[in-house]
Amino acid sequence: MATDRIFNFSPSEFAFGFESCQKCYYDKKVHGIVLRTPFPSIFSKFDSLQKNYYHTKSSKLISQDLEEGEIVANYNKMLYSEVLYDNKKRPFTMSGKIDGYIKHKDSFTVIDFKTTSISEKKIYTYTTQLQSYALMMQKPRKGSLKLEPINRLGIFCFDPSNISATNGKDCSIYMNTKWFEIKRDDQSLIKYISGILEVLNSEEAPKENPSCGICNFRKKII
């Protein structure tokens, strides 16, 4: 296929898009073929509650290891990067929304709230997402939010643990929380995106993934 096309990436689509099935990801980005599945609304509710509670509070509420700063969790505008280039000088752009950031005295930390099991494995799952947010905000399109310098990144995980009380109408749910720091590495991210662009610019689509439900469904109906 022609290599002059400029692909736009969403930071959240790497882990559950490209990593899940390269065939389906290729069809989505190259041919516009997308199977849309509803996102459980309960996670959006949790996300909203978390952002509302932590907005304007101290970073120390997330982790004592973080430098003192104010949490900003009410920025709801889309973010857009300038035109970026991979290791083969192929252009691409990025766009998406952040959960929040911490405003320190001389720097910023990007944070993302996750309602998920608490495990260090989540660092690897969400590394490209957080690294992408940082790159977008340090190299924004004109008019998009610019934060500089962004020295730290991380995910703040919420894992429901138990119900302490109930009266028939409501209940108190406790959640364990954990901050996981993610290393900022722009070169590693560009290398990763270069690999994605190699797949998307190939004349041949990736093979179907035997562990992908959509690929297996396609086999049965074609």
What residue spans do the PLM features occupy?
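Residue-level signal for well-ordered alpha-helical scaffold segments within enzymatic catalytic domains
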Residues: 28-29, 53-56, 109, 132-139, ...
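Metal-dependent nuclease catalytic cores that hydrolyze phosphodiester bonds in DNA/RNA
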Residues: 1-107, 117
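Hydrophobic/aromatic-lined pockets within catalytic cores
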Residues: 30-31, 118, 138-142, 201, ...
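Short catalytic/ligand-binding loop motif for oxyanion handling, primarily in non-cytosolic enzymes
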Residues: 26, 34-35, 118-120, 161-165, ...
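Mg2+/Mn2+-dependent nuclease catalytic core
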Residues: 84-191
